């Protein structure tokens, strides 16, 4: 008990901190990183990319060589950069204000910024089950120190289904073995109880009939329950599969269990709470025991083919290699030798972890005859094995202190006068109320068996191991591709134990029976050359070989002293078995699948026994169906979005940006300016929301602390009530004893015994008090001790109440401090000068509207300029028709005096006549009618520009006052007749 100055202790377990935590620096770095990524993605929308200008070609072709010039581009770039910089400054200021507000001393720290989230799995796996508190629930709670039934939910009525996906995510298809301490505590209590009353029990006889047989026989049944926040996962469907196949020997290093369906419960199924060693169990346990007959998973395994493996795959629960049945902390419960049959280490004890995988299942006794396994009569006389399996305990079995027959119908029941609790033996005499000689046919029985070669995934058939001198070279008897992992690719034509050189370079011993059936393959990486060098170094084996001789079924080597080499007890190579002094007796040496070169004395590849388990191992096996979890259905933790979600969001943003229209810089500047004004209005609410959330988080945390303190008060009160109840039970027992004494005194007084010097009072029986002495707490404490514990409970409860009241006061204070949004804004900033700009809002809006109108006007003017430039490029070709004036005949003869036709080099001055306004209008109107603009309704307003274009053309040709004249040009005149000249209405023709 701690002192009153220290913090009061809790009755529940600690270690309930949030599973995930992040520092504020990590959060800030993450935010900055995401902001930089968004900026890189958005780069180029405002600057850095050239926007294409719209051009209009009246002739239907684009002027590829004409360079477009935007006179507003420098202004747009400069203004956009200025606005962008202002927005960046505003953003930095807002972030700085937010960080300053969150770093205030009276607010929660960055580590305390938490969120109430739902755990995706709903629970957390507990690997160290010895740290989990547990209690028992039974009807006989007054005798056993357990809780009454109803204190915990019934697992058959209240449970939660767990999906297969969550099971695979948490357990990775590996339902592990757990050495639970709960059964060990029960065994420790029984052992302590027997030791404290050992002297009294030695004086008893087998005629004494007591209620203690319910305890010994395991009739008191109950459940194991775990308190919140712990729970139990009860598997409903499971199967086993091999893992880590050894490529040298072919055995499975691990057999894993895959649970595909489970339920979360608070308590286990009902089971015997305590019992001594026994053979058969009650029929109430049959379903639970049968559930441990785990079948192989539906995968490609050789043992699933009954033609290759008669009987199919093995069924049962595989206790893994390396499991520790009794941990080091309770080594005093181990005893000298293991009492559990095949559940033992390599020395037959429980001190070391298991060296071989052990299977436990409910036995199938349908094929047994007179208490013996099938084909038992066909065994060799005196042998304890048949069909490759060595059986322990066939004939006589130990059951609840009695020797009974393995034949359930014989009814043999001999009392031994001893009880085995774990590895300790206690003399005890009792006459049980149950029928010892009953026919126990149909009762469930545990069967413990071991595959020493651990090749259960290949075959469930047990074989008798070959002796080393029966291993010979299989010349021509083995075909196919043989290996320790592929038995099906191998064929044999003769029974025997064939030494074969594998394709991988090692050696194989192929066991062939019935001239064609391969029952086993043992292998090693040692090649033939290395083995033969060892063989040649053996004494007197230079001229020997491993060839098969003899007419036996299996064959043998020629010289028994030159068999397959092995390492002797001195770890030296030898080829001969050890013999006696006279040389008449010779050791039987066998070859094992996992020890190819060792000195193996075990004849059979399997070991099995019936029964032999006490309540501790019975509970331990039934509890393997359960896994302890820590419920985290609603807990505090930091939410971290997965990377796939962030990538999906980034893709969505990019797709949305690609779908947006490409706008020019000035439009984006206007939009950003509007957004900046809106952001300035919303930034205040955002900061106020952050402040309000900060206060709210503090209040929620205070409420959580107050609730936790109240929970501690409830737990301490419950512990105190339990202690008071214990004192009341002691008081009841003592008062009952006093009443019995008073009653007897009154009876003796009526019988006139009062005149004696003392009353005729006999000693009362105290068996009832002895029944409860084995529990973990002592019920026979003195009143002074009980009062002292009550005072300690009261002091602890007072401290907890004060702490709870303080936490509640803090929670109420924090709850009252939560302000509304506007008060939070006033607290965060000084808004007296911030709202002065509101009077300029109308002017700002008018300015924005004016900018928009100006922008529209500039767009219209720009389009008009583009249209004018295109129309201005229309060219007309002037065709001058020169009509020769008539000349005198006498002059004609004079001009033709050179002997030519008079038209070879004649030049006239070009006579040019100016176009009238009507001619220009006709040409322009004809160009408009033939242009593609006339067919598009969006360009119809451009028709209003035609008069301006006509005036401009006329002024360009004639000048402002018509003073401009064309320069005279001399042109060649074709000498043609006037009748052949074209007749035109005017002098201008459009080309």
Curated annotation (Swiss-Prot):
Lipid attachment in record (S-palmitoyl cysteine): 864
Superkingdom of the source species: Viruses
Signal peptide per UniProt: 1-106
Cytoplasmic topological segments: 862-991
Ranges of the Extracellular topological domain: 107-840
PTM characteristics: Specific enzymatic cleavages in vivo yield mature proteins. Envelope glycoproteins are synthesized as an inactive precursor that is N-glycosylated and processed likely by host cell furin or by a furin-like protease in the Golgi to yield the mature SU and TM proteins. The cleavage site between SU and TM requires the minimal sequence [KR]-X-[KR]-R.
Keywords: Cleavage on pair of basic residues, Coiled coil, Disulfide bond, Glycoprotein, Host cell membrane, Host membrane, Host-virus interaction, Lipoprotein, Membrane, Palmitate, Signal, Transmembrane, Transmembrane helix, Viral attachment to host cell, Viral envelope protein, Virion, Virus entry into host cell
Keyword Membrane included in the entry's annotation: yes
Official protein name in the record: Envelope glycoprotein gp160
Organism listed in the record: Maedi visna virus (strain 1514 / clone LV1-1KS2) (MVV)
């Amino acid at each position: 008990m701690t002192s009153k100055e220290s913090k009061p202790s809790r009755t529940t377990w600690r270690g309930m901190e949030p599973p995930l935590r992040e520092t504020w620096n990590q959060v800030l770095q993450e935010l900055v990183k995401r902001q930089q990524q968004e900026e890189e993605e958005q780069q180029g929308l405002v600057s850095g990319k050239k926007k294409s200008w719209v051009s209009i070609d009246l002739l239907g072709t684009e002027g590829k060589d004409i360079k477009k010039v935007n006179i507003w581009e420098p202004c747009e770039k400069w203004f956009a950069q200025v606005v962008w910089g202002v927005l960046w400054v505003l953003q930095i200021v807002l972030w700085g204000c937010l960080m300053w507000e969150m770093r205030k001393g009276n607010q929660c720290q960055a580590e305390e910024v938490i969120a109430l989230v739902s755990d995706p799995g709903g629970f957390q796996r507990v690997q160290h089950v010895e740290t989990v508190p547990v209690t028992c629930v039974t009807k006989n709670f007054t005798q056993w120190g357990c809780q009454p039934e109803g204190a915990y939910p019934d697992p058959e009525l209240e449970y939660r289904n767990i999906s297969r996906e969550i099971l695979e995510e948490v357990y990775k298809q590996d339902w592990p073995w757990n050495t639970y301490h709960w059964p060990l505590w029960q065994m420790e209590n029984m052992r302590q109880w027997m030791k404290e009353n050992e002297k009294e029990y030695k004086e008893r006889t087998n005629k004494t009939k007591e209620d203690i047989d319910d305890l010994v026989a395991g009739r008191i049944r109950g459940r194991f329950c775990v308190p919140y926040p712990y729970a139990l996962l009860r598997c409903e469907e499971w199967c086993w599969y091999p893992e880590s196949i050894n490529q040298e020997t072919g055995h499975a290093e691990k057999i894993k269990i895959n649970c595909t369906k489970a339920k979360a419960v608070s308590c286990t199924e009902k089971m015997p709470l305590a019992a001594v060693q026994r053979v058969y169990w009650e029929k109430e346990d049959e379903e639970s025991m049968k559930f441990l007959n785990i079948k192989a998973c539906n995968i490609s395994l050789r043992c699933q083919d009954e033609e290759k493996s008669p009987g199919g795959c093995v069924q049962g629960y595989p206790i893994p290699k390396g499991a520790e049945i009794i941990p080091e902390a309770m080594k005093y419960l181990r005893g000298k030798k293991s009492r559990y049959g095949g559940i033992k280490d390599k020395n037959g004890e429980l001190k070391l972890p298991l060296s071989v995988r052990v299977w436990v299942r409910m036995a199938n006794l349908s094929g047994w005859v007179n208490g013996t396994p099938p084909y038992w009569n066909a065994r060799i006389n005196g042998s304890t094995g048949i069909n490759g399996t060595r059986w322990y305990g066939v004939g006589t079995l130990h059951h609840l202190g009695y020797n009974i027959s393995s034949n359930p119908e014989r009814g043999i029941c001999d009392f031994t006068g001893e009880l085995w609790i774990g590895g300790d033996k206690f003399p005890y005499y009792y006459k049980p109320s149950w029928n010892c000689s009953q026919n126990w046919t149909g009762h469930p029985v545990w069967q413990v068996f071991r595959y020493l070669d651990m090749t259960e995934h290949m075959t469930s058939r047990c074989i008798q191991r070959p002796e080393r001198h029966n291993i010979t070279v299989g010349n021509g008897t083995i075909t196919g591709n043989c290996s320790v992992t592929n038995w099906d690719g191998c064929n044999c034509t003769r029974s025997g134990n064939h030494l074969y050189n594998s394709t991988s370079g090692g050696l194989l011993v192929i066991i062939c029976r019935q001239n064609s059936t391969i029952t086993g393959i043992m292998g090693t990486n040692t090649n033939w050359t290395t083995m033969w060098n060892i063989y040649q170094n053996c004494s007197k084996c230079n001229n020997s070989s491993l060839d098969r001789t003899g007419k036996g079924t299996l064959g043998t080597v020629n010289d028994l002293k030159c068999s397959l080499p092995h390492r002797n007890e001195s770890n030296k190579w030898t080829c001969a078995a050890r013999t006696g002094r006279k040389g008449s007796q010779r050791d039987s040496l066998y070859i094992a699948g996992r020890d190819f070169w060792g000195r193996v004395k075990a004849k059979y590849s399997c070991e099995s026994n019936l029964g032999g388990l006490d309540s501790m191992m019975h509970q331990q096996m039934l509890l393997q169906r359960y896994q302890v979890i820590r419920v985290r259905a609603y807990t505090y933790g930091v939410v971290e979005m997965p990377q796939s979600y962030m990538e999906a969001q980034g893709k969505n943003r990019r797709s949305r940006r690609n779908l947006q229209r490409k706008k020019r810089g000035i439009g984006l500047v206007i939009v950003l300016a509007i957004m900046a004004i809106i952001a300035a209005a919303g930034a205040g609410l955002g900061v106020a929301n952050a402040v309000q959330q900060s206060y709210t988080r503090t209040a929620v945390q205070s409420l959580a602390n107050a609730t936790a303190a109240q929970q501690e008060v409830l737990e301490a009160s419950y512990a105190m009530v339990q202690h008071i109840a214990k004192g009341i039970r002691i008081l009841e027992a003592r008062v009952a004893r006093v009443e019995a004494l008073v009653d007897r005194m009154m009876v003796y007084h009526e019988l006139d015994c009062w005149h004696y010097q003392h009353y005729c009072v006999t000693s009362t029986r105290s068996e009832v008090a002895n029944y409860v002495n084995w529990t973990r707490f002592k019920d026979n404490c003195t009143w002074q001790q009980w009062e002292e514990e009550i005072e300690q409970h009261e002091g602890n409860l007072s401290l907890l109440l004060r702490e709870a009241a303080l936490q509640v006061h803090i929670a109420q204070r924090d709850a009252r401090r939560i302000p509304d949004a506007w008060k939070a804004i006033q607290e965060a900033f000084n808004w007296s000068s911030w709202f002065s700009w509101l009077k300029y809002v109308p002017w700002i809006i008018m300015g924005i509207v004016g900018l928009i109108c100006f922008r529209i006007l500039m767009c219209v003017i720009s389009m008009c300029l583009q249209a004018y430039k295109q129309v201005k490029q229309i060219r007309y070709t002037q065709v001058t028709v020169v009509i020769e004036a008539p000349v005198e005949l006498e002059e004609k003869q004079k001009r033709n005096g050179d002997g030519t036709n008079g038209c070879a080099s004649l030049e006239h001055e070009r006579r040019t006549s100016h176009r009238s306004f009507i001619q220009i209008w006709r040409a322009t109107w004809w160009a408009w009618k033939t242009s593609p603009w006339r067919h598009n309704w969006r360009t119809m307003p451009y028709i209003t520009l035609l008069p301006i274009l006509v005036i401009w053309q006329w002024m360009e040709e004639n000048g402002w006052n018509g003073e401009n004249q064309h320069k005279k040009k001399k042109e060649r005149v074709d000498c043609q007749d006037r009748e052949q000249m074209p007749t035109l209405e005017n002098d201008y023709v459009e080309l």
